[in-house]
Each structure stands twice: as structure tokens, then as C-alpha cells.
Swiss-Prot record:
Pathway(s) of this molecule: Cofactor biosynthesis; 7,8-dihydroneopterin triphosphate biosynthesis; 7,8-dihydroneopterin triphosphate from GTP: step 1/1
A GO cellular component entry from the record: cytoplasm
Name of the featured protein: GTP cyclohydrolase 1
Subunit note: Toroid-shaped homodecamer, composed of two pentamers of five dimers.
Pfam families: GTP_cyclohydroI
Catalytic activity: GTP + H2O = 7,8-dihydroneopterin 3'-triphosphate + formate + H(+)
Keywords (A to Z) from UniProt: GTP-binding, Hydrolase, Metal-binding, Nucleotide-binding, One-carbon metabolism, Zinc
């Protein structure tokens, strides 16, 4: 792993050359190490199994009402431009037998967000993992995010927000269930 980090640091120095900066100037001397260290966290989702994040579940047949955790802040990196996108995710599910601690839902968002990603895929991955591990009656995930690839380059639209949703099980079949979830996350 150390050899990979050294090679990556040299790659960062090559980027300085490519953009026309001086790799030897004082402000850039430690930048390659800092970039590699920051990438350890930014891309830490590759080292985690999302199913294990939800691994501790509680069997609770009495809980059959909607569970919602909203406004889970996240940041991710666009797989097309390697620029950040960030925003909030809201998750809802209706347990069948299993519930999970709410911090696990936030960690599930993080594990998928900390990968090169597109928002549409991330939203679906969160919902699919909930369905696989918790086997609820249904799940719904809504993500809202600002994409720096649209803010800093391309069309340069600073106020645009992308909204994606993933709808599974009862949420997909029953409009009232979707409406209840949307009512919870609007307030």
C-alpha cells in the first residue's frame, strides 16, 4: 500500500506539471501527501461492505409503521469529472420484522457516498441495500444535491439542485405510502 501512495504522490506532482505550476514551489511541496491522505477518507467507501454497516439488526415484529430519517448530509465525488457533489438524503422504510439503529442509516449513506459515484446510482444502492438486509415491506430514498461539475464548469448553474429517488416495495405500489413519506421529509 505504501508503494501505491508514493506512486500516487508522484502522479499528483505530474498534474502540477500538466497544469503549468511549479511542483517545487513551497506551497505545493506537501500537497501530494495531503491529497493522498484526503483521498483515504473521500474514497473510504471502497473498503467497507454496506451490508455489514447494517449488520446489527433488531428483530421487532411490533414495529410496522414507517421509519424516516431525513436530511442526512453527504458529500461524494462525481465519477465523470472527479468533482464534488453534496447535499442531503432522506430514507424511509416500513419494517417487516427487522429494524436498525438510526446511525446505521447515516453510515449507509456515507459508505456509498464515499466512492466515485453518480447520484442516481447512489440513491438506488441505498434503497437496494435496505431491501436486501432489512427485508422491509418497502423503502424509499430521496437525495438532493448540488453538483460542482455544473457549478464550476460546463453550464455553470450555481443554484441548480438535482433530486433523485429510489422507490421499492410498498412505496412503489401504494401512492399513499409515498405521499406520507414525502410529507415527513418536506417539514
Amino acid at each position: 500500500m505504501e508503494d501505491k501512495k508514493i506512486a500516487m504522490e508522484e502522479t499528483i506532482r505530474s498534474i502540477f506539471d500538466f497544469i503549468g505550476d511549479d511542483r517545487h514551489r513551497e506551497g505545493l511541496l506537501d500537497t501530494p501527501k495531503r491529497v493522498v491522505k484526503s483521498w483515504d477518507k473521500l474514497y473510504s467507501g471502497y473498503t467497507q461492505d454496506p451490508r455489514e454497516i447494517l449488520g446489527t439488526v433488531f428483530e421487532d415484529g411490533a414495529c410496522d409503521e414507517m421509519v424516516v430519517l431525513k436530511n442526512i448530509e453527504f458529500y461524494s465525488m462525481c465519477e465523470h469529472h472527479m468533482l464534488p457533489f453534496f447535499g442531503k438524503v432522506s430514507i424511509g422504510y416500513i419494517p417487516d420484522q427487522k429494524v436498525v439503529g438510526i446511525s446505521k442509516l447515516a453510515r449507509l449513506v456515507e459508505v456509498f457516498a464515499r466512492r466515485l459515484q453518480i447520484q442516481e446510482k447512489m440513491t438506488g444502492q441505498i434503497a437496494d441495500t435496505l431491501m436486501e438486509v432489512l427485508q422491509p415491506k418497502g423503502a424509499m430514498v430521496v437525495a438532493e444535491a448540488t453538483h460542482m461539475c455544473m457549478v464550476m464548469r460546463g453550464v455553470e448553474k450555481q443554484q441548480s439542485v438535482m433530486v433523485t429517488s429510489a422507490v421499492r416495495g410498498l412505496f412503489k405500489r401504494d401512492a399513499r405510502t409515498r405521499e406520507e413519506f414525502m410529507g415527513h421529509i418536506r417539514h
